[in-house]
Amino acid sequence: MKRGENMYQILDSGERTVFPTGSVRDMHEGKGDMVSIPWESILRLSKHYENGAKKYQRWNFRKGIPVSSFIDSACRHLAKYQCGMDDEDHLAAAAFNVLGAMLMENTMPEMNDLPLRKGKKTFDYFE
C-alpha cells in the first residue's frame, strides 16, 4: 500500500435509499436495526458489567465459560425477578448471562455444552 492510500473501501450493496431531502444512502436492510435498541437498558446493563469487573476482573467472561453456566444463571436471575426479589438487578444479570451465552456461541463454540445444542449451527450475524 502506498502512503496516503486508504486500506478500506466503502462497501456498496448497489441499492439506494433516497430521502425526501434528495440525499441518498446505501440500503440498511440486513445490517441490523441499531436505532431501535433500548439504549437506556444498555446503560443499565453496563453498570452490571462495571460491577462484575470489580468482582471478577474486566473481560473475565471472555476467557470462556460453559454456555450451561450462563443459561443456568440467566434462568435463576429471571426466577428471582419473578419472585419479587430486589437484592440485586436480576434483569441486568439475566441479560448479562444471555449475552455471555451468545458470545460463547459466536467466539468459542466449544464452550456450548448443552446436550441439545452441541454441534448445531447457531446464528451468525456476520454471514
Regions found by a protein language model. Give the residues of each.
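Intrinsically disordered, low-complexity regulatory regions
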Residues: 1-127
